[in-house]
Amino acid sequence: MKRSSVSTCGAGRLSMQELRTLDLNKPGLYTPQTKERSTFGKLSTHKPTSERKVSIFGKRTSGHGSRNSQLGIFSSSEKIKDPRPLNDKAFIQQCIRQLYEFLTENGYVYSVSMKSLQAPSTKEFLKIFAFLYGFLCPSYELPGTKCEEEVPRIFKALGYPFTLSKSSMYTVGAPHTWPHIVAALVWLIDCIKIDTAMKESSPLFDDGQLWGEETEDGIKHNKLFLEYTKKCYEKFMTGADSFEEEDAELQAKLKDLYKVDASKLESLEAENKALNEQIARLEEEREREPNRLMSLKKLKASLQADVQNYKAYMSNLESHLAVLKQKSNSLDEEIGRVEQECETVKQENTRLQSIVDNQKYSVADIERINHEKNELQQTINKLTKDLEAEQQQMWNEELKYARGKEAIEAQLAEYHKLARKLKLIPKGAENSKGYDFEIKFNPEAGANCLVKYRTQVYAPLKELLNESEEEINKALNKKRHLEDTLEQLNTMKTESKNTVRMLKEEIQKLDDLHQQAVKEAEEKDKKSASELESLEKHKHLLESGVNDGLSEAMDELDAVQREYQLTVKTTTEERRKVENNLQRLLEMVATHVGSLEKHLEEENAKADREYEEFMSEDLLENIREMAEKYKRNAAQLKAPDK
C-alpha cells in the first residue's frame, strides 16, 4: 500500500488512542474546511479576523520514533473568520446564560450571578477558567504568576480555532474583550460536554467484536482495518514506504471474515466492471450536464409548488362545493315548504268556494247579518272599554294595597328591630318576662288580622313602661345623691390641690437651695481638680524635662565618643598614609637626585668635548654655510607663494 494520506498535527491532542489516517480521495470521509463555517451559530459578516500560520505538512512525532516526511514542509497564511455574532447582545447574553447555568448546575463554589458575569474581573475569570479546565484536567492548578500567558496557551493547546491575545487577559471585563472570552468559555463548556459524553459512552470495540455500529454516513468501524492502519503507521514511522506484507495479511483476514469463494471472484469482477462503467457513464452525464441536479431540484420545487397550488385549489373547490350543497339543501327545503303552503291555500280556496256555492242565504239576509254584526261589534267595543277602565281601577287599588302593605311591613320591621334591641323578642329574651311581643302580619286573614295583638302586646308593654318609669325615677334620685357627693368630693379635691400646690412650692424652694449647694460643691470640686491637674502637668513637665535633658546629654556623649573614635581612627590611617607617602617621596627624590647628578656629569663631559671641537673648527666658514642654507630655505619658501 502506498502512502496517500496527509496528516496535519494539531497542538494539544487529548485522546490517547491510535492516530487515524485520512484518505482524501475517498468521498464521504473528508469534509473540506471552507471559510464560511456554521459551527457556532449564525454567520456574521462584520467579525474580527485573525491570521495564523497553518502548517499543512508539518513535522510528525510518534511514540515509536520520528522520521522526516518526503513531501516537504511549507506553510500558508489563511484568514479565519469568526462566524459567531460577537457584536450581537442577544448572542452574548445567551452565552452568559449558558455559562451561568453550567456553573450553578455543576457546583461552582464561588458566588456568581448573571449581573456579575456581565463584566467580571480578571480574578473571577481565572477562578471560572480553573473550575472549567478542572473537568478536563482534574489535577490542574493555575500558576501564581503569568496567568495572562497560561490561559491563551491552554486554549491553543485544546485546539481553539481563534486567537486570544495576551493583552485581553489584563482587561477581561472590557466591552471589547469580554464577548470573545465568554464565547471561548462556552466553547470550553462544549468540549467538557463532549468529553463527558465520550467517557460515559461504551467503547468502540468489545473483546471479540470485529465490526462496530454503522454511522449516519454508512461507514462501519472495522477493528481489522484499525489494526492494519496501526501496523502500517508504525512501519511508516520507521521509514518504510510500501506495505505489501500488511496488505496481504489484511486481504487474507478479510477473505476469512467474509468467507470469500474464489470461484465467485470472476462474476464479482464482471459485476464490479459493470458498476464501474455505470459510474463512468454517470460521471460523463454529470460533466455534460453539471447543473442537472440544480435543474432537477428547481423542477422538483416547481412541481411541489404546483401540487401545493392544486391542493389549495381543490380545498377551495371542496369548501365552495360544500357551501353550494348547503345552499341547495336550504333551497330544496324552502321549495318544499312553499309547495305545502301553496297546496294549503288551494285547499282553503276550494273549501271556501264550496261554501259559497252551497250557501242558502239571499242578499237581504246577508245585509241584515252584516248590520247585526256591526251592532255586536259596537257592543263589544263598549264592553272592552268598560273592561279596560275596571282593570285600571283594579290596578290602582292593587298599587294602593301594595303601598299600605309595604308601610305596615316597614313599621313591623322597625318594631321588631327596636324590640330586639330592647331584648323583648324572642319570647325567651331577657326583658320579655315570658310574653310574646312578636307580631306576625298575614294580609290573607282579613282586616282584623292585627286586632288580637292589641291585647297580646299592649298590656304587657304598658306594664313594662310603668316598671321602666319607676326604675328611671330611682335612677334619677340616685343620680342626684351621687351629684351631691361628687360636689363634696370636688370641694375636697380643690382644697387638696391647694395644699399640694403649697407643698410643691416649699419643695421647689428646698430643691433650689439644694441645687445651689450642689453647684457650689461642684465648683469647689472642679477648682480643686483643675489645680490638682495643673500640678500633675507641672510635675510631668518637670520629669519629662529632666528625662529629656538626661537622654539628650547621653545621646550627645555617645555621639561625641563615636566621633572621637572615628577621628582617632581616621587620624591614625592618615598618619600612616602620610608616612608611607613621605617615605616613597624621599626614595624618589634620592633616586632623582642621583640620576640628575649622573646626567649633569654626562652633559658637562659632552659640553667639554663640543667646546673643544668648536674651538678647533673655522667659525667664519660655518657662518657662511649657515647663511647660504638660510637663503636657500627662504627661496624655497617664496617659490610656493608665487
UniProtKB/Swiss-Prot annotation:
As for subcellular location, the record says: Nucleus; Chromosome, Centromere, Kinetochore
Q: Where is this region: Interaction with the C-terminus of CDCA1 and the SPBC24-SPBC25 subcomplex?
A: 446-642
Residue list for modification Phosphoserine: S44, S55, S62, S69, S165, S242
Residue ranges for the region (Interaction with PSMC2 and SMC1A) are 361-547
Q: Where is this region: Interaction with NEK2 and ZWINT?
A: 251-618
Give the UniProt tissue specificity note: Expressed in spleen, testis and thymus.
N6-acetyllysine: which positions carry it?
K53, K59, K527
What residue spans carry the region label Nuclear localization?
1-250
Q: Give the start-end ranges of region Interaction with SMC1A.
A: 251-431
| Gene3D superfamilies from the UniProt entry | 6.10.250.1950, Ncd80 complex, Ncd80 subunit (1.10.418.30)
**Coiled coil start-end:** 240-403, 458-639
Q: Say which family it is in.
A: Belongs to the NDC80/HEC1 family.
- UniProt-recorded name of the protein: Kinetochore protein NDC80 homolog
User: What organism, scientifically named, is this protein from?
Assistant: Mus musculus (Mouse)
